[in-house]
Amino acid sequence: WIMGHMVNEIYQIDEFVDLGANSIETDITFDDNAMAEYSFHGVPCDCRRYCHKWEYINTFLDGLRRATTPGDSKFRKELALVVFDLKTGDLSSSTANKGGKLFGQKLLQHYWKGGNNGGRAYIILSIPDLDHYAFISGFKEALKTAGHEELLAKVGYDFSGNDDLGSTRTALNKAGVKDRERVWQSDGITNCVSTLFRGLDRVKKAVSNRDSSNGYINKVYHWTVDKYGSVRDALDAGVDGVMTNDPDVIVNVLNESKYKGKLRLATYDDNPWETFKP
């Protein structure tokens, strides 16, 4: 999976997919009432990127729906997976549940069109703070209450704070997410700091958890990877996805002889919740 990083304006969806992304990551900020408000990152952000692109959340979700709805003039068949980087820093552990509920309602209305022929992409809810696990509980509750529990089959989960894997598993379980129930595990650091500085130790631990008989992880992705050498290192470590500002770099690496016969770009027909067995 090539995950286009920080796609916060609608026009960027085409820009990143044109460069080779089959997945995008979008930042979601919340107002004082725990309501998702903008697709917006703000400063600081990755080097060589403009931090202030934004849309109102409803506008962005409408654009995203069109990009992932077959038959729409804006449809991009390559775009199969969307990571919502939920900026829950302004939520407390007590308002996280409300934030999740409201976000679930918003996705149902603006992305899934009330469950009637909405966007088809798979969704990952990515939360930076383990203490905000109730966001997931609230989100699930909103879809169940609305009578659309079936849409949860399109939703996966990630905690992005580089926490201890055991603690991450506990937080997921507290949110009612079973082991390997559509779980992605991210690991990474801003591109302003070399990924060599962070190293791949935790990535490798996540990969071995994924591949063990008693792990909790379905897939592993590494962020934010823009340099050729770092992409190769991540692929050699066994990741399923790479989040990047430069999707074309990942495409070029995948076309190298070492990887060409081994790896290919995922399509919509590849289930992003199934652990890949080469």
From Swiss-Prot:
GO terms for cellular component: extracellular region. Disulfide bonds join C45-C51, C47-C192. Its cofactor is Mg(2+). One of its GO terms (biological process) is killing of cells of another organism. Gene3D superfamilies: Phosphatidylinositol (PI) phosphodiesterase. Binds 1 Mg(2+) ion per subunit. It is found in: Secreted. The keyword Transferase does not apply. Coiled coil: none annotated. It comes from the Eukaryota. Mg(2+) binds at E25, D27, D85. The active site is at H5, H41 (nucleophile). This is Dermonecrotic toxin LhSicTox-alphaIV1ii.
